[in-house]
Amino acid sequence: MPLTVRVITPDKTVWDGDVQEAILPSTSGQLGILAGHAPLLTALDTGVIRVRPDKEWKSIAVMGGFAEVELDEIKVLVNSAEAGDAIDKEAAKAEYDAAQSRLEEASKGGEPREQMKAANAYKRARARLQAAGGLV
């Protein structure tokens, strides 16, 4: 019996389909969901949702949000999400490199606010690059 996964942003549905398994980036760590999972509501961190509709895994970059698991259905509500196959890997790599440099620079004595902004930009860039298949 498959799980139905829906990844929804305010302006579009990024994923809507049946999967055998899903892995969510919850704020307390990676969370694996199979059919028959107990009901659950969890906050999501910026990261990558991985779904397995058949033998191949698919990746979706998400920028935080919430996930609800109930009756073999996972509803993911996020402000921003991108399917990994829709992300330009080269552009994502350039964004990741720039964010990494900015984070290193901010860590060398920048203001706490700048350090936090750089860390958040790095997490977003890393999630996008991972979803595109450029980072393991």
Curated annotation (Swiss-Prot):
Family: Belongs to the ATPase epsilon chain family.
Gene3D superfamilies: F0F1 ATP synthase delta/epsilon subunit, N-terminal, Helix hairpin bin
Pfam families noted in UniProt: ATP-synt_DE, ATP-synt_DE_N
Compartments where found: Cellular thylakoid membrane
InterPro entries: ATP_synth_F1_dsu/esu, ATP_synth_F1_dsu/esu_N, ATP_synth_F1_esu_C, ATPsynth_dsu/esu_N
Species this chain originates from: Crocosphaera subtropica (strain ATCC 51142 / BH68) (Cyanothece sp. (strain ATCC 51142))
Coiled coil: none
Keyword Transport attached: yes
Task performed by this protein: Produces ATP from ADP in the presence of a proton gradient across the membrane.
Region Disordered, annotated ranges: 98-120
Membrane topology of the entry: Peripheral membrane protein
Listed Basic and acidic residues bias regions: 98-116
Subunit description: F-type ATPases have 2 components, CF(1) - the catalytic core - and CF(0) - the membrane proton channel. CF(1) has five subunits: alpha(3), beta(3), gamma(1), delta(1), epsilon(1). CF(0) has three main subunits: a, b and c.
Molecular functions per Gene Ontology: ATP binding; proton-transporting ATP synthase activity, rotational mechanism
Keyword annotations from UniProtKB, A to Z: ATP synthesis, CF(1), Hydrogen ion transport, Ion transport, Membrane, Thylakoid, Transport
Cellular component annotations (GO), alphabetically ordered: plasma membrane-derived thylakoid membrane; proton-transporting ATP synthase complex
Protein name listed in UniProt: ATP synthase epsilon chain
